[in-house]
A protein has these predicted regions:
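AAA+ P-loop NTPase catalytic core and its hallmark functional loops
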Residues: 1-149, 153
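Alpha-helical lid/collar subdomain of P-loop NTPases
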Residues: 124-231
């Protein structure tokens, strides 16, 4: 995150106890330590880090991948099996939608040094369904699996609605899992949907999201247009 510092990545002097005496000794940070071992280092939410700090990995991304520690007069050569990965919701372009507040725009010179950039889309519906069922054991029945499959359908409709620009909030697999867990607690699928996802949506868009739910489950929610019209 944005609190990761250069010292965390590169290393710093620390007071250690050796032979009963306190001495100052340099301790490798995350990057030098991982670089020297057969480790896959993953920078999760890479675009949340401060750009000036993330420049530390610039040389590691070069073809040779050597890391120079000038203060220590060391040149660290990467282990043959060392690999560096990163995840970023904005692909380094910065937050233009407001959904990923707190992320940073990554320097394009650094982005250019990543050899492979790929997109990880949502899971296929059967896979997402099986994950939820595996996490919520009470749904591991024929009726439960059918219910979860329909929940995933609602989630997919929010994703398509987001792509089309109809709504500004989207259901992640994590939200579907939370919905299933809350449904187990409250014994009410519609109420669980409202507290798990619908209440997080923009008030002006809730009727659209409630319609997604109605299309799949055939049940009107209090936020539905039809219910509001009857009032």
């Amino acid at each position: 995150d944005s609190h990761v510092s250069r010292l965390d990545l590169v290393g710093k002097d620390a007071i250690v106890l050796k032979e009963g005496k306190q001495i100052t000794e340099f301790q490798d940070g995350i990057l030098p330590w991982a670089l020297q071992n057969n480790i896959a280092l993953v920078f999760d939410e890479y675009d949340a880090g401060r750009p000036d700090v993330m420049f530390v990995i610039q040389r590691v991304l070069e073809q040779s991948g050597k890391l120079t520690l000038l203060d220590q007069k060391r040149v660290i050569r990467p282990h043959p099996a060392f690999r560096l990965f990163a995840t970023a919701n904005t692909v380094g372009l910065g937050d233009t939608s407001g959904l990923y507040h707190g992320t940073q725009q990554i320097n394009q010179g650094q982005m250019d040094r990543w050899n492979i950039v790929t997109t990880l889309n949502y899971l296929a519906a059967p896979v997402e369904t099986s994950i939820v069922v595996a996490k919520v054991k009470g749904l591991d029945t024929e009726a439960g699996r059918k219910q979860v499959a329909n929940m995933v359908k609602v989630a997919d409709m929010t994703r398509q609605g987001f792509i089309a620009g109809d709504i500004s909030t989207v259901m992640s697999p994590r939200t579907v899992l939370t919905w299933a867990q809350n449904a187990e607690i409250f014994k009410n699928l519609g109420f669980a949907f409202r507290v798990s996802f619908l209440n997080k949506c923009d008030e002006a868009e809730r009727s659209i999201v409630a319609e997604y739910y109605q299309r799949v489950f055939g049940e009107e929610l209090p936020e539905s247009v039809a219910v509001k019209t009857r009032r």
